[in-house]
């Protein structure tokens, strides 16, 4: 499954390689 690294924008389903999808001022990004 395609996933995003920390600091990258989450996919629409919130798929992160590690960490969680969090809402930030720049949109949703993957964070630990």
Curated annotation (Swiss-Prot):
The entry's keywords: Disulfide bond, Knottin, Neurotoxin, Secreted, Toxin
Any Pfam family hit: Toxin_29
S-S bridge residues: 3-17, 10-21, 16-30
Any one GO molecular function term: toxin activity
Function summary: Acts as a neurotoxin.
Family indicated by similarity: Belongs to the neurotoxin 17 (21C2) family.
Protein name: U13-ctenitoxin-Pn1a
Organism: Phoneutria nigriventer
The organism's taxonomic lineage, starting at the top: Eukaryota, Metazoa, Ecdysozoa, Arthropoda, Chelicerata
């Amino acid at each position: 499954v395609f996933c995003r690294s920390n600091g990258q924008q989450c996919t629409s389903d919130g798929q992160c390689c590690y960490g969680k999808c969090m809402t930030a001022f720049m949109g949703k990004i993957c964070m630990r």
